[in-house]
A protein has these predicted regions:
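Active-site segment of extracytoplasmic enzymes that catalyze sulfate/phosphate-ester chemistry
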Residues: 63-64
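Flavin (primarily FAD) cofactor-binding/catalytic cores of flavoenzymes
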Residues: 2-57, 70-182, 188-205, 210-211, ...
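Active-site-proximal substrate-binding core of FAD-dependent oxidoreductases
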Residues: 208-211, 373-401
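Terminal hydrophobic/aromatic helix or amphipathic segment near a protein terminus
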Residues: 217-229
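Short, surface-exposed amphipathic charged segments that create phosphate/polyanion-binding patches used
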Residues: 214
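C-terminal catalytic domain of Rieske-type non-heme iron oxygenases
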Residues: 266-267, 400-403
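Extracytosolic helix-loop segments that constitute the early lumenal/periplasmic catalytic or substrate-binding loops
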Residues: 67
Length: 457
């Protein structure tokens, strides 16, 4: 059996982009997907997905599409989860990737033996590959903290991963813990369905409306940016205060950081619900009693249901953790994809950033594929690349000083990151992905409803 192939674990956007680039370079590969369709978390029917019925993209279609495959013109500025899933399916179809995917195949483990990666699917014989790409996603392992006094609380406490639709909130007093984008979305769902909705936040945040002067916020930032970061932060901060006003009036805390220094909260609805009392802002939780939540400011609320929108832990369950160096629950990878310990092991999608990620995944995938190509056909060049990727990682946050938190450890500024990828590509004299795609002249499909979207939770 020819082992000069690449095993890709995961048929979500990260895995599919790697597959496209490998196919462009005529490098054989096999994708393993534990579910029955492509799309990863965007398929709400997948067990364990954090997706919920009301979810939409938080970056605009204009700034979020794959290179060479823009989102359809008839999509709204912020596509729904159904539209994003259709878009991913069409990406796989147009690029001829379905025939390379083994669906309903969960990987039990992957071991490295005699210079090869032995991929062990559940209920099947192991298969050996020369290269391995981990692209199984970072939103499958819930971070579920225990609340003080939870054992005596008679209400329900659950992680947001189990939340699917707002019917569950009917006639309940609901507290959402966490102000990430999922947390504020869920609080907005609770606003019109629950008896009363609350949201608990540890700190103050900057809320970015999805449209600024009628333009998607990320498009506006792209068109008006380009100056020094300190100036952009100052100007954007002033503008946000003009647009949203003094948020402490609504019970929110004043942010302790500059705008752009934390993951953006892209939401135009929560402030509306706070203004109308449909959602009430609360401080961090101190402890629970039998039927109340006691907050750190001493206030209390009777609550029936607590939703913990407390994020997810990075995990690669099929691979021994020793294959990566981990810091603050993040695998330490050069340019977020190259493993300094083993040049035949790559990862894609294990990063958090402040912009649309699909174009970033495209560029990452192309560099992974070109590195594999060098190992396959240009050993002298491959040796140089391997030595280069073993150096300490560069600062990918750019001029932004991100807040000190586990989530922001190794956080990536999109523009800084794309410049670093371009510099890496040009160092080895590689043609750009854009040029390669232009030569292939790929057809484009409009998103159409597929059978898997008929089942709505």
């Amino acid at each position: 059996m020819d082992t000069n192939k690449v095993a890709i674990i995961g048929a979500g956007p990260a895995g599919l982009t790697v597959a496209r680039s490998l196919k462009l370079l005529n490098i054989p590969f096999q994708i393993y997907e534990k579910h029955s369709e492509v799309g990863g978390i965007w398929d709400i029917t997948n067990a364990g997905t954090p997706m919920y019925q009301s979810a939409h993209f938080i970056s605009s279609k204009t700034m979020s599409g794959h290179l060479g495959f823009p989102m359809p013109d008839d999509y709204p500025d912020y596509p729904s989860r159904i539209q994003i899933h259709q878009y991913i399916q069409n990406f796989a179809q147009v690029n001829g990737l379905y025939e390379h995917i083994r669906f309903n195949t969960k990987i039990k483990e992957v071991v490295f033996k005699d210079g090869l990666w032995q991929v062990q699917p559940e209920g099947a014989a192991p298969v050996s590959y020369r290269w391995l790409v981990c692209a199984s996603g970072s939103l499958w392992d819930p971070n579920r903290p225990r609340l003080k006094g939870e054992e005596q609380f008679e209400g329900e406490v659950m992680h947001a991963v189990k939340y699917k639709n707002s019917d569950y909130f009917r006639n309940k007093r609901v507290l959402v813990v966490g102000a990430g984008n999922s947390g504020v979305d869920i609080a907005c769902d609770a606003a019109f369905m629950a008896q009363q909705a609350f949201i608990s936040m540890r700190r103050g945040y900057h809320f970015v409306p999805k449209h600024i002067f009628g333009i998607p916020a990320d498009v506006f930032a792209h068109k008006t940016g380009g100056g020094p970061m300190w100036l952009s932060q100052w100007v954007f901060g002033k503008m946000l205060r003009l647009l949203t006003g003094n948020l402490t009036r609504l019970g929110l805390q004043k942010p302790d950081h500059s705008v752009m220094s934390s993951h953006p909260i892209m939401n135009s609805q929560l402030l509306h619900y706070l203004q109308h009392g449909d959602v009430i802002a609360k401080r961090d939780i101190d402890h629970l009693t039998k039927n109340e939540v006691v907050f750190k400011d001493g206030s209390t609320e009777e609550v029936d249901l607590i939703i913990l929108a407390t994020g997810y832990k990075y995990s690669i369950p099929y691979l021994d953790k020793a294959f990566f160096e981990w810091k603050s629950n993040r695998p330490q990878l050069y340019l977020k994809m190259f493993n300094p310990q083993n040049p035949t092991l790559f990862a894609s999608g294990y990063l958090e950033t402040n912009g649309g990620i699909y174009g970033m995944l495209d560029q990452m995938a192309y560099l992974i594929a070109k590195s594999v190509e060098a190992q396959l056909h240009q050993p002298a060049l491959a040796k140089q690349i391997i030595a280069h990727t073993q150096q300490p990682p560069a600062n990918l946050g750019g001029a932004i000083k991100f807040v000190s938190s586990d989530r922001h450890t190794g956080y990536v500024d999109k523009d800084t990151y794309l410049k670093a990828l371009k510099k890496f590509r040009k160092k080895w004299g590689w043609e750009s992905l854009e040029s390669v795609l232009a030569r292939t002249n790929q057809p484009k499909l409009s998103a159409t409803k597929t059978a898997s979207e008929e089942a709505i939770v």
